[in-house]
Each structure stands twice: as structure tokens, then as C-alpha cells.
A protein has these predicted regions:
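Signature of uroporphyrinogen-III synthase
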Residues: 1-117
Length: 117
């Protein structure tokens, strides 16, 4: 099988190596460029949970002012891995898609606790 990866190398490298080791032909043609955007300052104390839909969100987020024990919902294992590397401790992880993430949030977060970001 020939597999084409279009994400930036740092987001694809692990899978590229894995598929090559399995004997597949792999090409890398990055057509997606991920860049930081400026955003309004966020008071993280206003939130009881954070939803991360991408490891890239964590890559560009200033995490110094965030309590690392806050509940974090992660879309998949790559996002979870990035959150762990930044010191987050209270992670709930879906199976890699938004539909599963939504169900996980509905099952595990009581909105009476406060707001989510």
C-alpha cells in the first residue's frame, strides 16, 4: 500500500516510521501549514475544564498560567501525549474523533461545576 501524509512532518513522523516498518511505501507532502494565531488573553481561572481538539492547540497555548490539575478533554492519543508532556494530569481522552469526544464530555462533565473552554 502507498500512503500519503499531508500534515507537517512533526505531526506525521511517528506514523510515517510505523507504516514504513510495516512494509508500506510512504510519501510525505505537507500541504497543511499550522501557525500560531494571536488571541485575546484568557483567564483560565474562569474555567473548570478545557477541551483540546488538537495537539496543535496545545503547541501554541501559553500553559504557564493554567492549573495542571484542571480537567482536560483530549480528542485522541496524540493530543493526550502532548498534554502530558506539558504537565497536565487530569486527562480524559476520546478515540480520535469529535463525535466520541462529545459523548465523553457529556458522560464525564457536570455543567453545574462551571464553564468549559
Amino acid at each position: 500500500m502507498h500512503i500519503l501524509f499531508t500534515r507537517p512532518l512533526e505531526d506525521s513522523e511517528e506514523l510515517i516510521l510505523k507504516f514504513r516498518d510495516l512494509g508500506h511505501k510512504v510519501s510525505h507532502m505537507p500541504v497543511i501549514q499550522i501557525e500560531k494565531v494571536e488571541y485575546e488573553k484568557i483567564n483560565f481561572l474562569d474555567y473548570k475544564a478545557i477541551i483540546f481538539t488538537s495537539a496543535n492547540a496545545l503547541k501554541f497555548l501559553d500553559t504557564k498560567l493554567i492549573d495542571k490539575k484542571i480537567i482536560c478533554f483530549c480528542v485522541g492519543s496524540a493530543t493526550e501525549k502532548k498534554a502530558l508532556s506539558l504537565g497536565f494530569q487530569n486527562l480524559i481522552t476520546a478515540e480520535g474523533n469529535v463525535r466520541n469526544l462529545k459523548e465523553l464530555i457529556l458522560q464525564n462533565f457536570n455543567s453545574s461545576l462551571g464553564k468549559m473552554l
